[in-house]
């Protein structure tokens, strides 16, 4: 393919698409660039593997440190496993792509996005999303695109398309909107408690920019003469399909309308019907018109049974306005909450139950040194002081499988719940702790990520973290049949599995802090998006009321096992003095007091210990070591050595002065040893600090009040 360039501008910021330059053997490839950030995106497909009954789409996002002119650390000096940011970006690309492929497609598809160059202004993630659409179109893969994504920021009252890192950091909103010609297909957002109307306006603003990028892609493929590829859906075996309807339709409808059934009971009854039909067909001769297709396609009955169940459940919601558990469309499942469910050795814990979904969240308070260092990736963010980790063990859904490290789904759910809480954390200056919350999903029937948001809030409040406001969350669903649309509040597992949307909304009573929307259909109108956001508000408030009935406000006392933090600000030029040669001084303080000490480059010293007295002692030691001495001040010091004309006294750690023999006592002193000995504690006043910083001390003229104050304040090392 010949090289071809196309540009589109947003507020003076260009996005360039370069075709035919790189990766000629990939099915489709594009270099998408904005500023000095450039991402190569490729799409390649392979024939379907036998027995696959799902879309085997793989999206990989790769970052290379050469993109920022850096060499990786470590012995190997090459990139290792993808950081969490790369995994989340891979999910960001996958989520708007997946619903645009035909649901019957089984070909292997691999999309790879590689950041080749990166500046300090333009994030590569939204470029990679748009680039993925272009690459898929160029690869000739059946696709209901084009699709594109933009980021929307909010500075003051002004929305910005594709803000820089600095604008994102300084703004009130970080919103990514992806869309197709049909409408919005994906939303990912973090916000500083913005009201619903502002969020809706931002999504609409972003989708208008998405439409411009879609138009640009259409013009591109027209200019290149590349047709949009369509492929006929494989024919459904009507003989088997009709047999299933005759045998199972009424029974399935009856089960779906038995609202008292538990999830397990409903699943067992549906499985029994499916197994009975399979046994009936298996007993037939191989040449029978019912059995022969199932021999060619072993999963045919299971797939058709799922499709029938899906249609009947959706029809029940559309026609009757009632769900499989008997709830109304806007009704939340029963909620119960508990705090302090674990011993106080754990700093804080919260148990959140919503229907059959149960999440146990545990909060841990750490020191500034426990912050997660993000310095190895390409992004400006240095470290995280709030971490949320989400675990989804197999027993939570009654299954068995190997327990492995967190997968992409767990990382994504953890990041969403983390993003929901960050806007309400207390400022670091007021509460310098590093916070980690782990959410253990103990039972899952939908909306576990929002359960983790609620559990995290309870655990942090139980731990005594002074949150600005508590956060709750709800997952919204959608059933769309033609022009008929039904929005569901607080979806459960079967509604997520068989529905068209999973829209998670988290926030406080003042506004939204996080959004995540994924679709299974090619797009959603802004009208429906707005309605879903608005319908989530009363649900969030209802859930929040239940949470606050359990614990109205954060506890005023920390767990006795949580570290006590004290901070002191020192002159940055004195950091070396506190650390000492080879860390000798700071190690000595930590060994003497049993504390942990963290020192920031700006001179902030944080002392942590479960023993408050020892923390205070360490603070006094550092204060005395770094405080400025003034003439006329009185100190309690220790005699370190004696010479013929006087004695040297350490008044503060590392700071010595000399008392001349004439200043040791009233009247004439014959020998220094007559008045003091090495190791004696003595009260001294600073007579003079000479031009070289040397201290001249005296024991004369010290008022009793000055002496008492010096003894009280002193800590002699």
UniProtKB/Swiss-Prot annotation:
Q: Where does Mg(2+) bind?
A: 496, 502
> Residues in domain KH?
563-622
Which Gene3D superfamilies has this protein been placed in? GHMP Kinase, N-terminal domain, K Homology domain, type 1, Nucleic acid-binding proteins
Q: Keywords on this record?
A: Cytoplasm, Magnesium, Metal-binding, Nucleotidyltransferase, RNA-binding, Transferase
Q: What's this chain's function?
A: Involved in mRNA degradation. Catalyzes the phosphorolysis of single-stranded polyribonucleotides processively in the 3'- to 5'-direction.
Q: Mind telling me which Pfam families this protein's record contains?
A: KH_1 (PF00013), PNPase (PF03726), RNase_PH (PF01138), RNase_PH_C (PF03725), S1 (PF00575)
Q: What is the protein named? A: Polyribonucleotide nucleotidyltransferase
Organism the protein comes from: Microcystis aeruginosa (strain NIES-843 / IAM M-2473)
Where does the S1 motif domain lie? 632-700
């Amino acid at each position: 393919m010949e090289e071809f360039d196309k540009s589109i501008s947003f507020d003076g910021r260009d996005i360039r698409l370069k075709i035919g330059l790189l990766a000629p053997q990939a099915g489709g490839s594009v270099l998408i660039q904005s500023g000095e950030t450039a991402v190569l995106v490729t799409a390649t497909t392979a024939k379907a593997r036998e027995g696959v009954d799902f879309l085997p789409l793989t999206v990989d996002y790769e970052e290379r440190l050469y993109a920022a002119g850096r060499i990786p650390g470590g012995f190997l000096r090459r990139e290792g496993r993808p950081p969490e940011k790369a995994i989340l970006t891979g999910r960001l690309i996958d989520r708007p792509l997946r619903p645009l492929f035909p649901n019957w497609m089984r070909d292997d598809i691999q999309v790879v996005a590689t950041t080749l160059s990166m500046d300090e202004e333009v994030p590569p993630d939204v470029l990679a999303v748009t680039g993925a659409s272009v690459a898929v179109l160029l690869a000739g893969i059946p696709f209901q695109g084009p699709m594109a994504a933009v980021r929307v920021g909010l500075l003051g009252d002004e929305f910005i398309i594709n803000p820089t890192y600095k604008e994102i950091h300084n703004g009130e909103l970080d919103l990514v909107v992806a869309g197709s010609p049909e409408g919005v297909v994906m939303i990912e957002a973090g916000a500083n408690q913005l009201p619903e109307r502002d969020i809706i306006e931002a999504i609409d603003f972003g989708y208008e920019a998405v439409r411009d990028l879609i138009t640009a892609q259409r013009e591109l493929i027209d200019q290149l003469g590349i047709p949009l590829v369509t492929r006929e859906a494989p024919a459904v075996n009507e003989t088997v399909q009709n047999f299933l309807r005759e045998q199972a339709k009424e029974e399935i409808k009856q089960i779906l309308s038995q609202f008292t059934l538990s999830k397990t009971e409903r699943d067992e009854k549906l499985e029994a019907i499916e197994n009975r039909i399979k046994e009936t067909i298996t007993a037939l001769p191989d040449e029978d018109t019912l059995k022969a297709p199932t021999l060619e396609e072993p999963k045919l009955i299971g797939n058709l049974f799922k499709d029938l169940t899906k249609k009947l459940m959706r029809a029940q919601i559309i026609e009757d306005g009632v769900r499989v558990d008997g709830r109304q469309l806007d009704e939340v499942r029963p909620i119960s909450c508990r705090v302090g469910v674990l011993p106080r050795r754990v700093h804080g814990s919260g148990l959140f139950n919503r229907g059959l979904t149960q999440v146990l969240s545990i909060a841990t308070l750490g020191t500034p040194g426990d912050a997660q260092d993000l310095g190895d990736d390409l992004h400006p963010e240095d470290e995280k002081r709030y971490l949320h980790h989400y675990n989804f063990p197999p027993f939570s859904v009654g299954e068995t499988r190997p327990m492995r490290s967190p997968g992409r789904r767990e990382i994504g759910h953890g990041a969403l719940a983390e993003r929901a809480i960050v806007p309400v954390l207390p400022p670091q200056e007021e509460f310098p702790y590093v916070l980690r919350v782990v959410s253990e999903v103990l039972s899952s029937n939908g909306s576990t990520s929002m359960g983790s948001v609620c559990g995290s809030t309870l655990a942090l409040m139980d731990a005594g973290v002074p949150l600005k406001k508590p956060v709750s969350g709800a997952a919204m669903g959608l059933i769309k049949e033609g022009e008929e649309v039904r929005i569901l509040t607080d979806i459960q597992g079967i509604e997520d599995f068989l529905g068209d949307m999973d829209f998670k909304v988290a926030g406080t009573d003042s506004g939204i802090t996080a959004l995540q929307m994924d679709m299974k259909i090619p797009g959603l109108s802004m009208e429906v998006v707005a309605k879903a956001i608005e319908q989530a508000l009363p649900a969030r408030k209802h859930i929040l009321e239940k949470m606050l009935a359990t614990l109205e406000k954060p506890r005023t006392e920390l767990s006795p096992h949580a570290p006590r933090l004290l901070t002191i600000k020192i002159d940055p030029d004195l950091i070396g003095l506190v650390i000492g040669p080879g860390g000798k001084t700071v190690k000595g303080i930590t060994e003497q007091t049993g504390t942990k000490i963290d020192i920031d480059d700006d001179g902030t010293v944080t002392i942590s210990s479960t023993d408050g007295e020892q923390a205070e002692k360490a603070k006094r030691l550092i204060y005395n070591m770094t405080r400025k001495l003034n003439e006329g001040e009185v100190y309690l010091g220790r005699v370190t050595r004696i010479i013929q004309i006087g004695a040297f006294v350490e008044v503060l750690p590392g700071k010595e002065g000399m008392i001349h023999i004439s200043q040791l006592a009233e009247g004439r002193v014959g020998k220094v040893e007559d008045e003091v000995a090495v190791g004696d504690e003595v009260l001294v006043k600073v007579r003079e600090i000479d031009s070289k910083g040397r201290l001249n001390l005296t024991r004369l003229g010290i008022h009793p009040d000055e002496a008492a104050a010096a003894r009280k304040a002193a800590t002699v090392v």
